[in-house]
Amino acid sequence: MNKTITSIVAALFLMTTVYAQNTKEMATIYDFKALNNKGEEVDMAQYKGKVLMIVNTASKCGFTPQYDGLEALYKKYQDQGLVILGFPCDQFKHQEPGTDEEIAEFCRLNHGVTFPLMKKIDVFGENAHPIFKYLTQQVPTEEVHGLKDKATMKLVDGLSKSEGREEGGVRWNFTKFLISKDGSVIKRFAPVAKPEEIEADIEAMLK
């Protein structure tokens, strides 16, 4: 009987935890957890005091070369407190079809990626990961400058909406969210924003 009661209590606790991760009331990014590409749980609270960049990635996208720029930023600022987390996603025209193991190997061999890669997830829709629901609620829009970039994002908008992306949702692969040392979501960068264009913001937040 005691074992049964214990099991019921544990199940209720798990359901409560899952529900909590899907609410809007989460105070900061540190209230969330995610799985890395090895299936291990990662508590975002471990990044308190760090500048955090969260990026949804893909291996077969026109923006995939941005892996190089992201890795360059990581190597340059890692010791100063920058953490980059890559969340692979296959929702945009199936541009990330591989397994987590295949994705990790691709990133290592082709782009020398050493920053942490997470388990492949959805970033919009019913099954969107709670972290991305939270991020897009905090910063639902991004600035795009220049006629060429605006034209690119207009095209991307149409494509992502055809995939079922909701208003305010992540518009394409390599959308970047920059989070301050206290867990505040400070800025959202469009896929067209190259990693090196974000460097000044990172430097300012690391001070």
Regions found by a protein language model. Name each.
Residues S7-T17:
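Bacterial N-terminal signal peptides
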Residues K50-V51, S59-K60, T64-P88, C107-H111:
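Conserved helix-turn-beta segment immediately C-terminal to the redox Cys motif
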Residues Q21-A45:
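N-terminal "domain-start" segment that seeds a small globular fold
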Residues G81-G98, T114-G125:
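Thiol-based oxidoreductase modules, predominantly thioredoxin-like and allied folds used
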Residues K187-L206:
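Non-catalytic, surface beta->alpha helical segment in thiol-disulfide oxidoreductase systems
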Residues M1-T4:
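Positively charged n-region of N-terminal signal peptides that target proteins for export
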Residues G112-V192:
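Thiol/selenol-based redox catalytic cores and closely related redox-interacting motifs
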